[in-house]
Amino acid sequence: MNIGLLGFGVVGGGVWELAQENRALNVKKVLVRREVPPLGETAVQDVEAILRDPDIDTVVEVLGGLHPAYEWICRALAAGKDVVTANKAVISAYYRELTALAHENGAALRCTAAVGGGIPWLVNLQRCRRVDTVTEVGGIMNGTTNFIMDAMARQGADFPAVLQRAQELGYAEADPSADIDGDDIRRKLTISANIAFDALLREEDIPAFGIRTVTGADMKDFRAHGFTCKLLACAQRTETGVAAYVEPALVAEGEPEAAVPGNYNLISCTGELLGRQSYFGQGAGRYPTAANVVQDCLDLLAGEDGFYTETARPMAVEADAVAHPYYVRTRTADPWLESVTADRWDSGVITGAVPVGQMLRWAAAQRQRDPGCFVAGIR
């Protein structure tokens, strides 16, 4: 396999290193922004040197971001080149366009590293789907937020201090919004649900509420009632669509998700025949992510196809099809909240079962009145 590698950052450097250990993988050219002496003549600064090279049969994209990654992936697929990417933003936003383009040109599109970092989640989800009807996918899909929630629960620390520590350790970006507001995990859920259900969901249709406003007092309240809080993604098959959403959730201390430490992930799928299967591991990092990129390349060599089918179709996102109780903390009185309140804890109230979509719409509106408002579903 002759590879054109787009990007030589943290993950790209890891891919290059791992590929050197496998004789079947020849990284012929690497797109870089500036000279990288160890790469020698392999390094190029013009993407055309890769996209127009007839000897390069596989393009590996690890640039990140939507553009120009999307345009370059499109050009590679249109030229009949297989594409391997770790770019969740591109795959989530343009899943329909990219899978169609790959199919039209007889090219493979693989993205195992886009969800779960080093966890072989998507390949095993695909294997489950081959023999069973998948009814639900989801779990802890973001290591940054799990690190924050775990540290707050274990150490009794407040959110700002733990976020700063996550940034110092390199787990959180300087601007952590994509992680703590739920955008990153929503992208991963979109990709997972599309593969699980042969769907064409759009990330903007999936409601999400993040952890930006959780407090140490909230966490103390949860612990006193036998819960811990995690940012969870969930997508369930319904009769007419998919109930998909992202929200903080109170998980009983004996449940598997409650025990997930630090920046680890725990992602699960449920099938009609196989029941629940879960995958645990590092959700990010140089070598875990690079390893899944290289695994995709090796799968292509073995004749494995890409993550798409001819039957993928648009499906309605129906977050209101699922209902459960919620913990709600807000300083602003609200008649609707009073009407659904069933119990009161020290820091907030507990509602009866409320449709997920309804609660997340209310929470988004309530944040305009009370920016510190926090909600969490109770599993």
Residue ranges of model-derived segments:
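Rossmann-fold NAD(P) dinucleotide-binding segment
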Residues: Q45-A86
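Glycine-rich adenosine-cofactor-binding loop
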Residues: N2-E17
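A conserved regulatory-domain signal marking ACT and ACT-like small-molecule sensing domains
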Residues: C297-R379
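NAD(P)-binding Rossmann-fold cofactor-contacting core
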Residues: E21-L39
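Rossmann-fold NAD(P)-binding glycine/threonine-rich loop
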Residues: Y70-R75, K88-R127
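ATP-dependent carboxylate/acyl-activation modules
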Residues: P256-A323
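Substrate-binding/catalytic subdomain of NAD(P)-dependent oxidoreductase enzymes
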Residues: L163-L266, G285
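Conserved anion/nucleotide-ligand pocket segment
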Residues: R127-S192
